[in-house]
C-alpha cells in the first residue's frame, strides 16, 4: 500500500512537471488579442530592432531534438524563433502547419556558421549538408517569452 501511494505521487509529479500546459500556451501566457499586423512590424524592424511584439505565423518546423527552436512563416518571411533563457520548449513534432502566435522580441541577426551548423544538426541534416554551411547568414529572429499554438 505504501509503495502504491508513493508511485501515485510520483506519477502526479511527473505529469505536472512535464506537461507545460493544456491550453496551447508555452512559456509566459499573454493576451493574444494584442496581435500586431506582421507587415507593419516588418516595415519598422530596421527602425526599432529588438522591440517587443506579438505576431502570428505558420509553423514550418521545430527542433526534433528538444523543441528548443522553431521556424515560422509570416507573410513571405521565414523567422527563426528561439525561447527566452531556454525556459520552455515546444513539441518536437506534429505542429507543422499549425498557427503560432508568439510574444517577444523580433530582430535581424547575423547567425554564425557554428550556430547554423548546430541547427542543421538538430534538424537531422546529413554531414555533407552541414559541411556546405560555410558563411554566416543574416536572418529574421525572434526571442519568444511565450508561444500559443492553435489546435493543441
Where are these regions (language model features)?
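Bacterial Sec-dependent N-terminal signal peptides
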Residues: 1-23
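OB-fold and OB-like single-stranded nucleic-acid-recognition modules
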Residues: 20-152
Amino acid at each position: 500500500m505504501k509503495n502504491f501511494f508513493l508511485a501515485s505521487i510520483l506519477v502526479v509529479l511527473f505529469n505536472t512537471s512535464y506537461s507545460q500546459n493544456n491550453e496551447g500556451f508555452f512559456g509566459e501566457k499573454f493576451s493574444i488579442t494584442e496581435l500586431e499586423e506582421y507587415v507593419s512590424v516588418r516595415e519598422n524592424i530596421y527602425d526599432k530592432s529588438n522591440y517587443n511584439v506579438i505576431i502570428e505565423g505558420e509553423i514550418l518546423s521545430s527542433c526534433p531534438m528538444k523543441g528548443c527552436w522553431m521556424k515560422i512563416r509570416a507573410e513571405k518571411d521565414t523567422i527563426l524563433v528561439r525561447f527566452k533563457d531556454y525556459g520552455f520548449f515546444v513539441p518536437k513534432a506534429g505542429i507543422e502547419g499549425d498557427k503560432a502566435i508568439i510574444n517577444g522580441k523580433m530582430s535581424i541577426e547575423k547567425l554564425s556558421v557554428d550556430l547554423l551548423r548546430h541547427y542543421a544538426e538538430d534538424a537531422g541534416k546529413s554531414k555533407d549538408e552541414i559541411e556546405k554551411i560555410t558563411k554566416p547568414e543574416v536572418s529574421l529572429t525572434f526571442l519568444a517569452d511565450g508561444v500559443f499554438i492553435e489546435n493543441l
